[in-house]
A protein has these predicted regions:
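Acidic (Asp/Glu-rich) sequence patches and key acidic residues
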Residues: 1-122
Length: 122
């Protein structure tokens, strides 16, 4: 994987986020991969990764692992990835951090301030 991010829930009362919470207000959608690697739009499979993608800039999208957790969400960007996918990774991370009131996230094992994530975009 090219990049891995972990966002911890900083709220006192922890509850998992719904996909509609995350994609609301953006041109993002989600789905899971079927047995043949095709995107099954709008479906959530708790046994596999969830894919978030930009409906206007299709690339590989962002994988959300452990998406049913109320404590931490694991985002992953796989190679090859488009520039749009890289930017979207950080936009999704910022959105989740905002919803969970998190000020820091882990980027490839390094603690980063959410307000200063732009320097992580290569």
């Amino acid at each position: 994987m090219a990049r891995e991010l972990f966002i911890r829930n900083s709220r006192l009362l922890k509850k998992p986020l719904s996909m509609s919470d995350i994609v609301s207000g953006h041109k993002w959608s989600y789905g899971t991969l079927d047995d043949h690697g095709r995107l099954d739009k709008g479906k959530i499979d708790n046994n596999g990764p969830l894919i978030i993608y930009d409906t206007e800039n299709i690339g590989r999208g962002i994988q959300i692992l452990d998406h049913d957790s109320s404590k931490e969400i694991h985002l992953a960007l796989v190679l090859p990835a488009t520039e749009g996918d890289v930017r979207m990774l950080y936009d999704v991370a910022k959105r989740i951090a905002e919803l969970w009131k998190s000020k820091h996230i882990s980027v490839d094992g390094d603690k980063e301030d959410v307000s200063n994530l732009d320097h992580c975009i290569d």
